[in-house]
C-alpha cells in the first residue's frame, strides 16, 4: 500500500538495472484485519503478501526468498516481522546488523541513484488504529502528500483525524507550509475541512506513541 509514484520509481529502477521481475496482483483491502486498520494489521498483510511471493518463487524453482528488513526495523514496532519469520523469509541485512544509514552508504558507493531516496511507509499508517480504510481515503492522503513533495519537501506525512489533515514535516520545512496558503486550499479540495501543521515535526510511527 505505497504511493503510485514509489511503485513507478521501483519499476524504473528494475528496468534501468536490467533486473528481471514479475508483478503479482495483491489487494490488501480485501484482508479484513488490514481494512479495519487493527494495530497488528501489518502481521496479516505481510503474511499474505510474503506467502504469495514465496509460493510464486517456489513455483519458479527458487528455494529462498529474501527481504530488505534492516537492523533499524528490529528496534521499532513491526508486527510484520513476526509474519516473515513464520514464513521463513530471510533478512540478510538485518542479520549482519546493517542499518538504514549503512544501506545508504553502500548504495552510494555502488552508484545507485536512489541511495538517498527518503524513506516512506504504508499509507495505512496515516490513520488512527481501528479506522476503516477505503481506497478513496488512502488516495486523498497520497494526493495531499504529493502536493507537498512538489514544493521540495522530501519527507511528508498527512495524518488523518476524520475531517482534519494533520501535516507532519521535518521542522526545517515548517515555514514552507506556513508561508504557502495555497497548500491549505489544495488539501481542502481533497475533502478535508481543516488543515493543520504538527509542531512536533515529523514523527515515525506517530499513532504508536
What are the residue ranges of the model-derived segments?
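ATP-dependent adenylation/nucleotidyltransferase module used to activate substrates
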Residues: 1-109, 150, 165, 181-192, ...
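Proline- and acidic/polar-enriched loop/turn elements at helix boundaries
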Residues: 26, 69, 118-119, 160, ...
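Short secondary-structure transition/capping segments
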Residues: 34-37, 77-80, 127-130, 168-170, ...
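Non-catalytic, surface-exposed connector residues within folded enzymatic/regulatory domains
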Residues: 36, 117, 177-178
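Short alpha-helix boundary/capping motifs
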Residues: 42, 85-86, 134-136, 176
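Mid-to-C-terminal catalytic subdomains of enzymes
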Residues: 94, 98-100, 104-148, 155-156
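Peripheral terminal appendages
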Residues: 142-209
